[in-house]
């Protein structure tokens, strides 16, 4: 598999010109699957279908969309320029055109407390699968872009607790509706203790790889 993440939208002409597509598609044809990011508002037939044709039938195209959260008010406050209906339409278009859908879900976005964070992570997982997602990536929301630090000083943001991320991952996997992964980058921001962080990383990576929740349950039982 090949993942091309460009910290933006692959089909944004300001990010990746269409003139570069033939070379990119040619290189990607040696892979079974190509995963690219796309903003839900940029799901456009005149851009995506030509690239899909360049790839050919031997390489499966998977589009990764950021839902972030299915919480209507929080989604609006995140200023992504989408709502649930826009996301649903984009997801339906992707599945209708025989592409796979990967969805990014934030675990504990701003404006939610810990119990709300777990509830809405699970509800967002349900919503993503209802939209036809094959894969869901759970992203623990972490500071680092300035805006979140500002929200943190006002008490409107804090990173999720490790057990919230583990519980959300366990919920998604046990549904059996598709693959669910937890992002393990920068875990020390969730768990600064080196020994506990190493154990957390091992449990998450095992669950990611095996798509089983036994290791997560053991970790949650130990607290």
Where do the PLM segments sit?
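Active-site-proximal loop/turn and secondary-structure-junction residues that shape catalytic pockets
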Residues: 8-10, 40-42, 69-71, 107-111, ...
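Core AdoMet radical
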Residues: 1-16, 27-44, 60-87, 137
């Amino acid at each position: 598999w090949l993942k091309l993440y460009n910290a933006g939208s692959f089909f944004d002409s300001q990010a990746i010109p269409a003139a570069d597509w033939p070379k990119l598609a040619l290189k990607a044809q040696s892979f079974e699957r190509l995963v690219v990011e796309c903003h839900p508002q940029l799901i456009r037939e005149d851009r995506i279908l030509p690239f899909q044709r360049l790839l050919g039938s031997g390489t499966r195209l998977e589009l990764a969309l950021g839902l972030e959260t299915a919480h209507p008010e929080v989604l609006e406050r995140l200023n992504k320029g989408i709502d649930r209906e826009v996301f649903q339409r984009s997801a339906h278009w992707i599945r209708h055109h025989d592409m796979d859908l990967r969805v990014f879900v934030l675990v504990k976005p701003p404006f939610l407390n810990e119990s709300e964070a777990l509830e809405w992570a699970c509800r967002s997982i349900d919503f993503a699968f209802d939209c036809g997602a094959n894969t869901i990536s759970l992203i623990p929301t972490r500071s680092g872009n300035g805006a979140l630090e500002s929200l943190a000083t006002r008490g409107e943001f804090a990173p999720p607790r490790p057990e919230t991320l583990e519980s959300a991952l366990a919920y998604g996997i046990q549904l059996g509706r598709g693959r669910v992964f937890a992002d393990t980058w920068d875990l020390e921001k969730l768990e600064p203790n080196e020994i506990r962080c190493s154990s957390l990383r091992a449990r998450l990576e095992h669950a990611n790889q095996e798509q089983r929740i036994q290791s997560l349950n053991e970790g949650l039982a130990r607290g």
